[in-house]
Amino acid sequence: EYMLLSRLYNIFGHMKIQMKKQQAKSIHVERAIDYIYENYSKNISVTDIAEYLGIDRTYLYRLFKEEYNMSPQKYLLNFRLKTAMNKLEGGNMSIAYNCGFNDASAFCHQFKKVYKDTPLNYRRYPQLAIRE
């Protein structure tokens, strides 16, 4: 009976350690996402995010891959494009700059690459767009 209790104690202790490690990872990802939400309209990079969190850039990539199956760079791009899509529906003219793209051409290129349509077509016919 003592052996069984000792073994259970060890198992639960190990589980507790693993849960704390997972929570720490999740906190880094949550803070990274908060940073993205607050700064997406600026010219930020994955290095900026990692430095803000005080962690290694490679580690940040790994955390995002585990959590979202994509890089933080891809997450940032998707967030910018979805924000732009919402602004297109509202008719905002300075969408590219407001969403952190350096110029309208880069924005249009990325938008078309991801959504297979131009921002102008999306603005004209938002009801026809395929939503992710």
Describe the residue ranges of each PLM region:
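Terminal helix-turn-helix DNA-binding modules in bacterial transcription factors
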Residues: 34, 38, 43, 47, ...
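Conserved phosphate-coupling serine/threonine residues in phosphotransfer and NTP-handling enzymes
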Residues: 118
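An amphipathic alpha-helical interaction segment
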Residues: 1-37, 55-61
